[in-house]
Curated annotation (Swiss-Prot):
<keyword id="KW-0929">Antimicrobial</keyword>
<keyword id="KW-0732">Signal</keyword>
<dbReference type="Pfam" id="PF08023">
    <property type="entry name" value="Antimicrobial_2"/>
</dbReference>
<keyword id="KW-0165">Cleavage on pair of basic residues</keyword>
<comment type="similarity">
    <text>Belongs to the frog skin active peptide (FSAP) family. Ranatuerin subfamily.</text>
</comment>
<dbReference type="InterPro" id="IPR012521">
    <property type="entry name" value="Antimicrobial_frog_2"/>
</dbReference>
<protein>
    <recommendedName>
        <fullName>Ranatuerin-2PLa</fullName>
    </recommendedName>
</protein>
<feature type="signal peptide">
    <location>
        <begin position="1"/>
        <end position="22"/>
    </location>
</feature>
<keyword id="KW-0964">Secreted</keyword>
<feature type="disulfide bond">
    <location>
        <begin position="66"/>
        <end position="71"/>
    </location>
</feature>
<comment type="function">
    <text>May have antimicrobial activity against the Gram-negative bacterium E.coli.</text>
</comment>
<feature type="propeptide">
    <location>
        <begin position="23"/>
        <end position="41"/>
    </location>
</feature>
<dbReference type="GO" id="GO:0050829">
    <property type="term" value="P:defense response to Gram-negative bacterium"/>
</dbReference>
<keyword id="KW-0878">Amphibian defense peptide</keyword>
<dbReference type="InterPro" id="IPR004275">
    <property type="entry name" value="Frog_antimicrobial_propeptide"/>
</dbReference>
<keyword id="KW-0044">Antibiotic</keyword>
<keyword id="KW-1015">Disulfide bond</keyword>
Length: 71
C-alpha cells in the first residue's frame, strides 16, 4: 500500500512539473506572437513605402525621358 501511494505521489509530482513547463512555453510563444505581428506590420509599411517610391521614380524617369526625346 505504501509503495502504491509513493508511486502515485511521484506520478502526480511529475505531471504537475510537466504541466507547469508546458504553460510557461505556451506563454512564451504567445509573447513572441505579438512581437512577430508588430515586426510584420513594420515590414509591410516599409514594403509599401518602397513600392511607392519605386513607382514615383519610374514615373519621373518616364517624364524626363519624354522631355529629353520630345515625345
Amino acid at each position: 500500500m505504501f509503495t502504491t501511494k509513493k508511486s502515485m505521489l511521484l506520478f502526480f509530482f511529475l505531471g504537475t512539473i510537466s504541466l507547469s513547463l508546458c504553460e510557461q512555453e505556451r506563454g512564451a510563444d504567445e509573447d513572441d506572437g505579438v512581437e512577430m505581428t508588430e515586426e510584420e506590420v513594420k515590414r509591410g509599411i516599409m514594403d509599401t513605402v518602397k513600392n511607392v517610391a519605386k513607382n514615383l521614380a519610374g514615373q519621373l524617369l518616364d517624364k524626363l525621358k519624354c522631355k529629353i526625346t520630345a515625345c
